[in-house]
Amino acid sequence: MSEVEIENAATIEGNTAADAPVTDAAVEKKPAAKGRKTKNVKEVKEKKTVAAAPKKRTVSSHPTYEEMIKDAIVTLKERTGSSQYAIQKFIEEKRKELPPTFRKLLLLNLKRLVASGKLVKVKASFKLPSASAKASSPKAAAEKSAPAKKKPATVAVTKAKRKVAAASKAKKTIAVKPKTAAAKKVTAKAKAKPVPRATAAATKRKAVDAKPKAKARPAKAAKTAKVTSPAKKAVAATKKVATVATKKKTPVKKVVKPKTVKSPAKRASSRVKK
């Protein structure tokens, strides 16, 4: 072999020796990287399965709320029903293993039972429905559902009745108008009649005014009384003033029969004679 061939062979062996450890290191590193990824993926999957695990449903040691409420109402035996507080107290004394939200749940169940018709609410108390009410409730529901189907016929009948009623009202109004005219004539006649009453009242007033003038003539007797008794003068004067005041106060509109009043002069003369 020549020297050139020997040198080429040596360089090839050196290159292969240098390349061998690099490839081994690369091969060793790659599996390590793959192993880390698989570990992370497994950990995430395990966490997800733990979180997604369904919670076990806790079985309550007490019966349903409906049964407990009915039992409380039956045992309490109140005539007007049992209040929420009484039912709550009874259940708490009888059942010791109750949840912390028992009172809220009791109120919700009471409302639900009242809405469904299993309980009857009277003011602030609850009681069981009577047997007659239970029997009548299905019948009432059936009756309500039956007329609901026959609504179109009833609507047509009501429309026809409304038209007939409107026509009859129009006829009545036409017939009533002549009556109103006749009534107006009658009222006008009635208003014209009371005129003679006013004339009669005027004549009575004139007669009343004329009578006192005729009675005021005997003034001579008053003069004789003045001479005999000076103390009686003041009494007669006061009486005259009183009679004048009463005459002024009498209203003109009222027609009053004249009273037979003696004049003060005559009274004085009668007292002197006594």
From Swiss-Prot:
GO MF term list: DNA binding; structural constituent of chromatin
Keyword Chloroplast appears in the UniProt entry: no
Biased composition (Basic and acidic residues): 40-49
Cellular component, GO annotation: nucleosome; nucleus
Biased amino acid composition, Low complexity: 16-25, 129-145, 175-185, 221-233
PANTHER family: HISTONE H1, HISTONE H1.1
Name the record gives this protein: Histone H1.1
Originating organism: Arabidopsis thaliana (Mouse-ear cress)
